[in-house]
Design a protein with these regions (language model features):
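Patatin-like phospholipase
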Residues: 1-198
């Protein structure tokens, strides 16, 4: 696929699979995280819309409208972007969590004044509150995950390096980061399999 073009999704393979999944997004009106599963997806376009809703970073990307409701990135929700609540609701007690920040990372306070968010999201006070509370929620969930890891109930897969940010657009740098990640995954796969087998 050329830069600027959409990467086609293999809808046929998706439709043939019965593997369960969850897509989490933040409901801008209620301030709650909503999780969609296979049963909620009608077609390829609907799937794409839900994925966009799940990853629409506040301010950087527009809200996504779905069935008359505005959604943003699920990372601003109650668990700070970790879908542990969804996994628990589905009955899971052990968790493999793929991290995007280095070991020891904690989110610092929101830097921009609250008034900026209040102006941008004046119709959505729940979004303002969620953005302002994200560091607290993220850090609290990460503390919980680290405790679960100490108890043998979670495997936190940290990147050895993260040479790109979520706003990276340079294809060469993205590809290089991907290759680094694949090398680490191959090295760490035996330990991950051992955890999953336990």
């Amino acid at each position: 696929t050329a830069p600027g073009e959409l990467l086609p999704y293999n809808w046929e393979a998706y439709s043939a699979s019965s593997t369960p999944f969850k897509i989490g997004s933040f409901d801008c009106t209620t301030g709650k995280t909503v999780y969609w599963g296979r049963e909620d997806v009608k077609d390829n376009s609907d799937f794409t819309t839900r994925c966009q809703a799940s990853s629409s970073i506040p301010i950087a990307m527009p809200m996504v409208q779905l069935d008359g409701t505005a959604y943003l990135d699920g990372a601003i929700g109650e668990t700070g972007g970790f879908a542990v609540d969804a996994a628990r609701a589905d009955g899971y007690e052990r968790f493999l969590v793929v991290m995007t920040r280095p070991r020891g990372y904690r989110k610092g306070p929101v830097k921009a004044p609250a008034a900026i968010y209040q102006k941008i999201f004046k119709k959505y006070p729940a979004v303002v509150e969620a953005i302002l509370r994200r560091p607290e929620r993220y850090n609290a969930t990460l503390d919980e995950l680290e405790q679960l890891q100490a108890e043998g109930k979670a495997y936190l897969y940290y990147p050895e390096t993260m040479p790109v940010s979520n706003g990276e657009r340079n294809a060469v740098r993205i590809q290089a980061a991907y290759e680094e990640g694949m090398q680490q995954a191959r090295r760490d796969l035996p330990a991950i399999k051992e955890f999953l087998a336990g």
